[in-house]
């Protein structure tokens, strides 16, 4: 995609320079987003853990959801996958498929959401791609993490007789979506806000995942 295709400096390279390059400023492996790929050197004694989730407007989020919330949710559901493997996050790659009529302030809000959460979780952008499309708005993110070699939490270690433990409350996110759609009535205002927040912003349990490494026989993420 060229600048001429989208006009007004909102083409791929202009958007990368203005909105995405700053997200990679503190990530040496990203090489300033000036090359075709990132160069990542694994920490000695660590295994790399890769996770990818995609989100599509009207399927995984509402079309009127704030772009900041969409970006943060996209990052967090991937970080939750890393947490389920006992991994610490290192960075991420993001691919964005933007409808041709998507306003530039939506994209700016999306980048702002990524910036807010990458700062919160101490990571940075490694690379990605942007494409203009007839629609729908689609987003894909790959999270990269590390875990002590051979210590990744797997699903296949579960066995009959194991104690099953759940962190958090199952169903809060789904209830939050129903609340946003007006499908729940009579809810306390504070509870409704809490449920909607859980829908928008799942909490990656990175510290818990790390704590469970070497202790739990199996683990799975159910945040999304």
Predicted regions and their residues:
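Helix-biased detector of long, well-ordered alpha-helical tracts
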Residues: 1-224
């Amino acid at each position: 995609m060229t600048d001429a295709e989208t006009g007004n400096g909102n083409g791929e390279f202009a958007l990368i320079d203005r909105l995405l390059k700053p997200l990679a400023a503190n990530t040496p492996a990203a090489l300033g987003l000036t090359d075709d790929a990132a160069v990542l050197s694994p920490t000695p004694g660590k295994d790399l853990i890769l996770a990818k989730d995609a989100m599509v407007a009207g399927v995984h989020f509402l079309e009127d959801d704030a772009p900041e919330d969409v970006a943060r949710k996209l990052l967090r559901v991937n970080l939750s996958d890393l947490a389920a493997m006992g991994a610490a996050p290192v960075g991420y790659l993001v691919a964005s498929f933007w409808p041709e009529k998507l306003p530039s302030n939506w994209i700016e809000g999306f980048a702002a959401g990524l910036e807010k959460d990458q700062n919160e979780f101490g990571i940075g952008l490694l690379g990605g791609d942007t494409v203009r499309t007839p629609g729908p708005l689609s987003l894909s993110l790959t999270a990269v993490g590390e875990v002590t070699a051979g210590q990744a939490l797997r699903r296949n270690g579960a066995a009959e007789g194991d104690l099953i433990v759940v962190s958090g409350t199952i169903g809060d996110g789904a209830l939050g979506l129903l609340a946003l759609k007006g499908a729940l009535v009579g809810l306390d205002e504070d509870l409704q806000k809490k449920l909607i927040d859980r829908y928008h912003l799942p909490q990656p349990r990175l510290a818990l995942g790390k704590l469970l490494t070497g202790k739990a026989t199996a683990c799975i993420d159910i945040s999304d």
